[in-house]
Amino acid sequence: MARIAGIDLPNNKQLQIALTSIYGIGRSRALEICKKTGILPEKRAKDLDNEEVNKLRKIIESDYVVEGKLRSELAMSIKRLMDIACYRGLRHRKGLPLRGQRTKTNARTRKGKRKTVANKKIAAK
């Protein structure tokens, strides 16, 4: 089992798919990495030898920001926006959409579960 960037690659998957299990690597980056290392993207992860795993590990660690470092960079970026109190930072703080989407209806994913407010009862005549 190949272990790259602290993640065990799934054995039975093709290398181009297995690499996407690493946070920060998608399909296009996975193909790019395969091309740089000269390993066939269709090769199964279980068929990689130590030399190929070391090549992959070396390229990923030197050229790409992945896993924990990427997560912390994103968190720091969001924290900076919140600290300088810009519009995007305020929207992050309130848990609302950032990019101009409507919030009167929709935006449920960002706002969370509905919070019902009791209606005022109409006075009986």
Swiss-Prot record:
Gene3D superfamilies: 1.10.8.50, 30s ribosomal protein s13, domain 2 (4.10.910.10). GO terms for biological process: translation. The keyword Nucleotide-binding does not apply. Residues 101-125 are annotated as: Disordered. Keywords: Ribonucleoprotein, Ribosomal protein, RNA-binding, rRNA-binding, tRNA-binding. One of its GO terms (cellular component) is cytosol. It comes from the Bacteria. PROSITE patterns: RIBOSOMAL_S13_1, RIBOSOMAL_S13_2. Belongs to the universal ribosomal protein uS13 family. Located at the top of the head of the 30S subunit, it contacts several helices of the 16S rRNA. In the 70S ribosome it contacts the 23S rRNA (bridge B1a) and protein L5 of the 50S subunit (bridge B1b), connecting the 2 subunits; these bridges are implicated in subunit movement. Contacts the tRNAs in the A and P-sites. Part of the 30S ribosomal subunit. Forms a loose heterodimer with protein S19. Forms two bridges to the 50S subunit in the 70S ribosome. This is Small ribosomal subunit protein uS13. It comes from Borrelia duttonii (strain Ly).
